[in-house]
């Protein structure tokens, strides 16, 4: 109070007022603070006092010719005095108004294209629906979210090159446009922005918004996709939330969502193959999401999800250093430990070998629906503070933390044997055995854990073994908090290694991820996922396997037919026939394989019996190890549409129908492609072109006269024989075919016959 009174007295003296208003500020530190750097230190104040001046704006000199000195009301629009320190003109805000009303009208066609992200946002909001407002405590946790709907996923460098090429094509400087997306975007934008009059800098800013993912670390309680984040300020406050359904989806959210689904499907499928890592890479490289190669998306997309990270690790990309256990992301925030192998006995007296973490450590655990802070010592949980959306989510987090703590009472709570296996029928490691066991039923675990009296701490309550809240008692060391635990904010990425069973380790050898951590949740992808790999054919069921197998044979017929005659065993062992085996009744696989292989051998031995359609139809049945038996089949059974359907060895059936007239094949009523009987000029070469329609009988036979040239062959009558010179000076005996129907691929028989002794 005293000070204020003193100030009032001072201010009443005119001298004080004079000092404060007239004296120059000459304290160097203050001058430095407000004048160093280009950054405005107090933008709001600056704006206020600038706008209070008569001419706060500067403009190019040309403005004088374009704007009158005074407007209709006689107010001055620009000053004759130059802007100090530049040759620009000082202009009044009224000039802007005059220009907006009377200035030249320009085409508006480019505005929606340049400001595309804004126009799209308006549309989403217009069609979005806002529901009721609910007042309740919001458990928000900070997550790294995408704040920029509708962007491509280019890196900053890639985007910079595209922007320079589109906006400043004549500027000097090396620009490398290599990725498919860069080239497509550049071409598209150049066309869209022809004759665009909008300031290049503005266009560049807007392009950046469209091309680059911008993320922020924000407190979120609900949806984290970018179309929710753009209305975060409308949908959640400190004590309220408003329901909202976006009025449209954006491609970047769809890419994120579809990428997760594709990665999960691929990891699950790779796990059960003979070489999981090789299979995973093959699938990643041959899959497209929304028409873009999955490997390109993986390189650019920062989504952190277990399956996605396994795929990234396989490609040699860096990933986050946090590790995953029980579907929670663990990040060590302090402490350290060493790992020692230890043998422990379960409540069922089964011996488990576990890697014990010795030492004090603190972790944050972040899951989709619950988060926690965990403090632990060697095989002992010291404290767990959990928060979650509901009882179920909180229970999930508690189970994971209890198992992770490796406490003896947890291991002793196991009832029955632990024999969980993964998709490939391999036993899970002990920690995951325990986790699966208690995820199925945690009653004994919670009952045996122990309870304690609790102190009354603000924002914390206890939780009882039956998962009900309490203010007096709680599971030992466990508390439930109203506040969430923030996700790990760092975007740091580390180099990792991956073994052939898809276990991902950091450079110290700690396992960060393994296929056990990949969620089994099934979703429907927003964008079309095209798995070109035969390993993924079965994802859409038996029919898809059938159609895809035959389509593959037809697409690769040129190479398949050469292998069929020259190296059948290699052909039979092709991985593309693997998925088909699951359609053949188990008991019949070996018999069918033996039967068809024998049939094919006869075709190769007996001249003129080569039948393209039949080979295509029966080829997938040769993949199983053959059983030698005298059995003959007129039809082969495949299990599709919930029952056994027959493929006729000779002739058409609903499963496999070849239309001679159109030369098209339909499998289960679906078009599987056309059989092009004309050989590819480039591949089969002259011999096959010549020998089409001729049967090769063997080596040259002098009785049939001198070798004819290729052109002279056409004069032969059906059934007539002649010697002919082919290829590298070989002479063979041929006969012109009597029937046209068998003119299928004599060329292969040709190459075989030439080799005859």
From Swiss-Prot:
GO molecular function per UniProt: RNA binding
Disulfide bonds: none
Alphabetized UniProt keyword annotations: Cap snatching, Eukaryotic host gene expression shutoff by virus, Eukaryotic host transcription shutoff by virus, Host gene expression shutoff by virus, Host nucleus, Host-virus interaction, Inhibition of host RNA polymerase II by virus, mRNA capping, mRNA processing, Viral transcription, Virion
UniProt site (Avian adaptation): 627
Span of the annotated motif Nuclear localization signal: 736-739
Compartment list: Virion; Host nucleus
Keyword Nuclease on entry: no
GO biological process, one term: symbiont-mediated suppression of host gene expression
GO cellular-component term (any): host cell nucleus
Function (record text): Plays an essential role in transcription initiation and cap-stealing mechanism, in which cellular capped pre-mRNAs are used to generate primers for viral transcription. Recognizes and binds the 7-methylguanosine-containing cap of the target pre-RNA which is subsequently cleaved after 10-13 nucleotides by the viral protein PA. Plays a role in the initiation of the viral genome replication and modulates the activity of the ribonucleoprotein (RNP) complex.
Quaternary structure note: Influenza RNA polymerase is composed of three subunits: PB1, PB2 and PA. Interacts (via N-terminus) with PB1 (via C-terminus). Interacts with nucleoprotein NP (via N-terminus).
Family: Belongs to the influenza viruses PB2 family.
Protein's name in the database: Polymerase basic protein 2
């Amino acid at each position: 109070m005293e000070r204020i009174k003193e100030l009032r007295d001072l201010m009443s003296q005119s001298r004080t007022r004079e000092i404060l208003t007239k004296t120059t500020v000459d304290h160097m530190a203050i001058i430095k603070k407000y004048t160093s750097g280009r950054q405005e230190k107090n933008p709001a104040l600056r704006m206020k006092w600038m706008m209070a001046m008569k001419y706060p704006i500067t403009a190019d000199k040309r403005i004088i010719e374009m704007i009158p000195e005074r407007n209709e009301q006689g107010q001055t629009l620009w000053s004759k005095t130059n802007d100090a320190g530049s040759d620009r003109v000082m202009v009044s805000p009224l000039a802007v108004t005059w220009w907006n009303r009377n200035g030249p009208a320009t085409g508006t066609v480019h505005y929606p294209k340049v400001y595309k992200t804004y126009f799209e946002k308006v549309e989403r909001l217009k069609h979005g629906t806002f529901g009721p407002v609910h007042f309740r405590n919001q458990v928000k946790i900070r997550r790294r979210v995408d704040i920029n709907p509708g962007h491509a996923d280019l890196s900053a460098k890639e985007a910079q090159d595209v922007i320079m090429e589109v906006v400043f094509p004549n500027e000097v400087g090396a620009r490398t446009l290599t990725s498919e997306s860069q080239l497509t975007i550049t071409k598209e934008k150049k066309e869209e922005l022809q004759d665009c009059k909008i300031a290049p800098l503005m266009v560049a800013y807007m392009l950046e918004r469209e091309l680059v993912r911008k993320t922020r670390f924000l407190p979120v309680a609900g949806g984290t996709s970018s179309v929710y984040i753009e209305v975060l300020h409308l949908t959640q406050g400190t004590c309220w939330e408003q329901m909202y359904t976006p009025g449209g989806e954006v491609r970047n959210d769809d890419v994120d969502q579809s990428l997760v689904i594709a990665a999960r499907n691929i990891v699950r499928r790779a796990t059960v193959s003979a070489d999981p890592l090789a299979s995973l890479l093959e699938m990643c490289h041959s899959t497209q999401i929304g028409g873009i190669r999955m490997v390109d998306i993986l390189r650019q997309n920062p989504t952190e999800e277990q399956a996605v990270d396994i795929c990234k690790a396989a490609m040699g990309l860096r990933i986050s250093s946090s590790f995953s256990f029980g579907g929670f992301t663990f990040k060590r925030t302090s402490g350290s430990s060493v790992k020692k192998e230890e043998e422990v006995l379960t409540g069922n007296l089964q011996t488990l070998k576990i890697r014990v973490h010795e030492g004090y450590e603190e972790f944050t655990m972040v899951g989709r629906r619950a988060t926690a802070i965990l403090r632990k010592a060697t095989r002992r949980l010291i404290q767990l503070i959990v928060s979650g959306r509901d009882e179920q989510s909180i229970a999930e987090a508690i189970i994971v933390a209890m198992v992770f703590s490796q406490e003896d009472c947890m291991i002793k709570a196991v009832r029955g044997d632990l024999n969980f296996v993964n998709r490939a029928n391999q036993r899970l490691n002990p920690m995951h055995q325990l986790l699966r066991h208690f995820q199925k039923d945690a009653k004994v675990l919670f009952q045996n854990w122990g309870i304690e009296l609790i102190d009354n701490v603000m924002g914390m309550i206890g939780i009882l073994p039956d998962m009900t809240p309490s203010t007096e008692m709680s599971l030992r060391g466990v508390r439930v908090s109203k506040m969430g635990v923030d996700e790990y904010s760092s975007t740091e990425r580390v180099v990792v290694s991956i073994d052939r069973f898809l276990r991902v380790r950091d450079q110290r050898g700690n396992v960060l991820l393994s296929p056990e951590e990949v969620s089994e949740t099934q979703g429907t992808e927003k964008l079309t996922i095209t798995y070109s790999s035969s390993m993924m054919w079965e994802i859409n069921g038996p029919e898809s396997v059938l159609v895809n197998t035959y389509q593959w044979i037809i697409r690769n017929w040129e190479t398949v037919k050469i292998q069929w005659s020259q190296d059948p065993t290699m052909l039979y062992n092709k991985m593309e026939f693997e998925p088909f085996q699951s359609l053949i009744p188990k008991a019949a696989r070996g018999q069918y394989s033996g039967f068809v292989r024998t049939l094919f051998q006869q075709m190769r031995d007996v001249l003129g019996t080569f039948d393209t359609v039949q080979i295509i139809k029966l080829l997938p049945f040769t993949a199983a190890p053959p059983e030698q038996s005298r059995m003959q089949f007129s039809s082969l059974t495949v299990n599709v549409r919930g029952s056994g359907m027959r493929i006729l060895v000779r002739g058409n059936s609903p499963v496999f129908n070849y239309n001679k007239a159109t030369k098209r094949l339909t499998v289960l009523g679906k078009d599987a492609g056309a059989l092009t009987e004309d050989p590819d000029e480039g591949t089969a070469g002259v011999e096959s072109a010549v020998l089409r329609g001729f049967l090769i009988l063997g080596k040259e036979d002098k009785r049939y006269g001198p070798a004819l040239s290729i052109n002279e062959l056409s004069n032969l009558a059906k059934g007539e024989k002649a010697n002919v010179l082919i290829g590298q000076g070989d002479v063979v005996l041929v006969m012109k075919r009597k029937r046209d129907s068998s003119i299928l691929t004599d060329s292969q028989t040709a190459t075989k016959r030439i080799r005859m002794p």
